[in-house]
Amino acid sequence: MPEYMINGIPVNFPFEPYELQKNYMAKVIECLQNKTNGVLESPTGTGKTLSLLCSSMAWLLHMKSKQPKHRMETIDTLPEPPELSNAKHAALDPEQALALQQQKANAKMKIIYASRTHSQLSQAMQELKNTSYLFVRSIILGSRDQLCIHPDISKQENNAIKTVLCRESVKARNCSFYNRVETAKDRPDVATVPVMDIEDLVTVGRKLKACPYYLSKELVEQADVIFMPYNYLLDPKARKSNGLSLQNTVIILDEAHNVEKMCEEVGSALLRSSDIALAIEDTSSVIKSMMDGGGAWTGDGEKQLELTLDDLVLLKEILLGVEKAVDDIPILFSQGGTTHPGTYIFDLLEKANIKFGNINVVLQVMNSLITHITTEKTGGFVRRGAGLQSMVDFLEVVFASSGPEYRQAVEKCFRVHIEPEEPKQLAKGGVKRADGWTATKQPLKAPVKSTSKVINFWCFNPGFGMRQLVDSGTRSIILTSGTLAPLKPFISELSLPVAVSLENPHIIARSQVYVKVITHGPDRVELNSSFKNRSNPEYIASLGRTALSLCPIIPGGLLIFFPSYPLLNKCSEEWQASGIWGQISRLKQIFVEPRGKDQFTTTMAEYYAQVRDPASRGAIFMAVCRGKVSEGLDFADANGRAVMITGLPFPPMMDARVVLKKQYLDTNRTRENELITGNDWYSLEASRAVNQAIGRVIRHKDDYGAILLCDSRFQNARQQAQLSAWIHSHLRESSAVPNFGTVVGEMSRFFRHMSTASLPARVRDVCAVKDEPAEAAKEEPGKGKRFATAVKGGGINTFAEKFRLSEYLPDSMKVNPHSRSTKSAGDDAEAGGSGLVTLYKRERNDGKGPPPSPGAFEATRKRRKIVIVPQPLVKREDTEDGENVLLPVKQEPDVAAAANVKRVAPENRVDFLREVKCSLSAGSYKTFLQSLAVYNRNSDFVLFIKQLCSCFNKPHLHYLLLAMRRFIKQEHTLEFDTIIEKIEARFFSDM
C-alpha cells in the first residue's frame, strides 16, 4: 500500500487520501505526539474509521520502533522470577505486588478503541484487516452472551443467569472449555492470528474446545490494540473485572456522540424496595439454615461459609434499617415523587449504619454471602442473590470515592429522586422479575407494597466519569464521531481538557445530495409532529400521502424515521385503516423496525433482499430515531436512496430525569465553564438524533441520495443551525419554502440526473474483501501519482524500511502487486500487453425496450465486473477465426531457465512477502507464516530451516529461500549460509 508522511510519521493508506482525510489523520497524530486530548468530527462516509485506524497504528509502530529491542519483547514474554511463581505472588507484600503489576502494565503501550456496540466494533476490526496494519496484535472484549460456547450455559437466555452459572462452573473447575484456555493461547491458531474479533474467537474456541470469553481476557496482555464497548471502559467495575490498566494508554472513543449519556448512566444507580425485601429474605434464609445446622452453613457446596452467625445477624439489621429508612421517606405519590440533593443519599444510608467508615466491610459480607447463595439449590428453586446483588451495585456507585471533594461533587452533580415502585408483570407459570431472575416453584416473597419506592441516584455531569479516565494515567483521549457539532457545548459538558479539535466537511460533491424541508403535505396540511399535533388524524393522513407521493420517484430504498415508537405504531395503524398502507405497498414493500434481536436481523435481511430484487421497485424501512436502525447500520447506495425525517425526537418533556438535567445545566452554567442552557441541551438532544438518522444514507464519496425533513419546525433557523454543517449549508442556499409540487419536480430531476451521472465504482463493490483495491493495481510502485504524493515532508518512505513486518506476523497479504492495468480485454489486445485484470462491459439499454422501473434502476447501473486472471497461467493464441484470445496454460517450472536466469527477490519486505504468497500454495504459505512466528518467538533455527526448505522445495523458488536471510537472527546467519551452500551444491550437481 502507498505510504504518506503525516506529521513526521509514515502512514500506510490503501489509496491516496483526500485532503480532509489527511487533515483528520494529522489531528489524530498531533494528539498522540503531544499527549493531548482531541475532539474530531468527520461526517459519515468520509473514511473516518479507516483514517483513525491507519494514523493511530502508524504512530504506535513508530513509537515501538524507537524503543530498544528488549523492550519490544515486553515483560510478558520473559520467564517469571521464582518469587512470583508461588500462589499468585502470595509471598510478596501487597505494595510490592502492585508495583510489579504496574511495571508489567507500563511495559507495553496500548490503544483502546471503544464504540457503542459490538456491531460497530466488528466493522472497525474488519477495516483494520483490510489495511497494511493487519499484523498489529488486536483483540476484542465481549460478554459471555456472545462468547460462551458451553452447551448448557450458552442456552440460558438471560445474561445474568449465564454469568452466575459460568462463575460457578469455573470455580469448581467443571468447565472443560475454561480448563483448556492456558494451552490454547499458545497454539498456532491463536498465536499466528493477530486480529481476532468476536467471530474469530468463537471459531477458534470451538476448534480448540477452549473458552473464547476467557481466552480473550488472556490475550489482552499481549495485545497492542484492545477493542471494547463503552461500558467496559467507562464503568469502573467493568474495568476491574477485565483487569484493564489505563496507565500510558491511548483511548479512542468512536461514535462519541453517545459518550455523554453513557458517562451519566455509569455514574448513576437505583435501588427498589423489592430489592431490599429480597436481600432481607435471602439473609434470613441463610441465618435459619445456620441455626438449624448448629451455627454452620454450607448450602450444596463443599466449602463452608466464611461468615459467622453474628456477621449475618448484623447484616440483616443493616438491611432492615435501610428498608425502614426508605419506607419512612415522605413522598406525594400523586405528584410522582420527590427530589433531594445528591448528599441526601449519605444521610439516608447512615440511618441504617452504612457509612464511609464501614462500607468496605458491609460490601465484603454481602459479596461473600452472594457467592454462597448462588450455589444453593433447594426444592427446584435456584437462589441467585438478586436482591443482595442490587444492593451491592447500588452501594458501589454511591460510595465510588470518599473525602470532602467527593461529597462536594456529589452535592453539585447528583440528585436523589424518589418515586413510587410500580408492580411488576408476572410471568405465566411462575414469577419473573424484570431483571431476569426467575423462581420456578414458589412465589416471590417480596410483593410490591403500596408504599414501595425506587431510590434513583442520578449523575448529571458526564465529566464526572470522564475525569476518572484522565486521572488513571491515560496518554491521550480522542473522541470522534460524524455528529458531535456544536463542539463547544460537547467539550464543556465532558469537562475534558481538549487541545485539538476538528470539524470536517463532507467528502461528496454538492450535486450528490438533495436536501429539502417539507412543511406541508400534498393536501396542504401542515406537517408538524409536536406532542399536541401527533394524534391529529389529518396530520397522520397527510404524512402518509407525502410518503405515497414520493415513492414513485425514489429508486431503491426509502428510510422513514419517526420520533418515537408510539408515533410509528400510530401511523402504521391509521395508514392501514385508511388504505394508504396498501397503496404504498403496491409501489414499495414496507418493513417496520422490530424490537426483538432475532426479528431485527431477519427483517433487515428481507429488506436488503427486496431492494436488490430487480423485479421490485425498492422497499421502505420505517424506524425510530435512537433505535437500532439509526445507529451504526449502513444503507449505502440503493439500500438507502432517500431518508424522510418525520419529526424532532425530543426527550419526554415531563420525565423527571429530563427536568432535573435542564435544572442542573441552568443552575451550574457560568461564563467560565461555557455550559449550555437546559433548553439548548433539550433541543440538541433531538438534533443529534436526527443527524445520526440522516447519516445512514450517504455512506461513501460516490453515494448519492435525498434528505427530506418533513416537519415545519425544521424551517426554524435555530433548529437548522444544530444540524450537521454539511446539511445546514444546503438549507442555507434555499431559504424559500417550496410547495410540495416543486419538491417532487426537483427531486425527480435530481434522481434522473444521478441515474445518468458517471460516478466511479466503489472499490469494495468490485473487489473481494481481501484483495488490493483496483485503483492500487493501476500503476507500478513508484511510477504513478498515487505513489508520489506525501502529506508533509515531500518524500515516500517504504513502510518495511521503518518496521520489520516479520516481527508482527502478517496473517495475509493482498493481491499480486505486479498488476499493471485495469483496461478491458480488447484494449489490452490492441496494446499487445497481457494485463492481469479483464473488464467485461455490460450492454446498455438502446432505448428500444421498455424503460427500467425505478426499483430496477440500480441493477442497470452496476459497476463493470472485474475478473482477476493470474498472469503466469494465461497465454495469447490465434483461433481458427483469426481472433487473438487469452487461453489458460499449464505452467511447469523450467529448471534450465531457473539456472540461467537468476531471479532476485524484492528488497522491500512488503513486496517480498507478497511475492512469497503469490509463489506458494495456500497451505504452504500458512506453514511459512506459522514457522516464521514460532522462530521469532522461540529462536528454534533447526525447526525453522527445515520448514523453510519444505516450503521452498522447487528450483524456481530457490531465490526466495536465499532472500529469507534477512529474517534470520544474527546468531544463526553463519549456519544459514552453510546450509544454503550445501543446497546450491546439490542443485547444480544435479544439473
Curated annotation (Swiss-Prot):
Per the record, which residues fall in region Disordered?
A: 812-833
The Gene Ontology biological process terms listed for this entry are: DNA recombination; DNA repair; DNA replication; negative regulation of DNA recombination; negative regulation of t-circle formation; regulation of double-strand break repair via homologous recombination; telomeric loop disassembly
| Compartments in which it is found | Nucleus
Catalytic reaction annotation:
ATP + H2O = ADP + phosphate + H(+)
**Main localization, broad class:** nucleus
Read off the SUPFAM superfamilies from this record: P-loop containing nucleoside triphosphate hydrolases
* Pfam families recorded: ARCH_RTEL1 (PF23109), DEAD_2 (PF06733), Helicase_C_2 (PF13307)
Q: Which residues bind [4Fe-4S] cluster?
A: C148, C166, C175, C211
Q: What does this protein do?
A: A probable ATP-dependent DNA helicase implicated in DNA repair and the maintenance of genomic stability. Acts as an anti-recombinase to counteract toxic recombination and limit crossover during meiosis. Regulates meiotic recombination and crossover homeostasis by physically dissociating strand invasion events and thereby promotes noncrossover repair by meiotic synthesis dependent strand annealing (SDSA) as well as disassembly of D loop recombination intermediates.
Identify its protein family: Belongs to the helicase family. RAD3/XPD subfamily.
- Name of the molecule in the record: Regulator of telomere elongation helicase 1 homolog
Tell me what organism the protein belongs to.
Anopheles gambiae
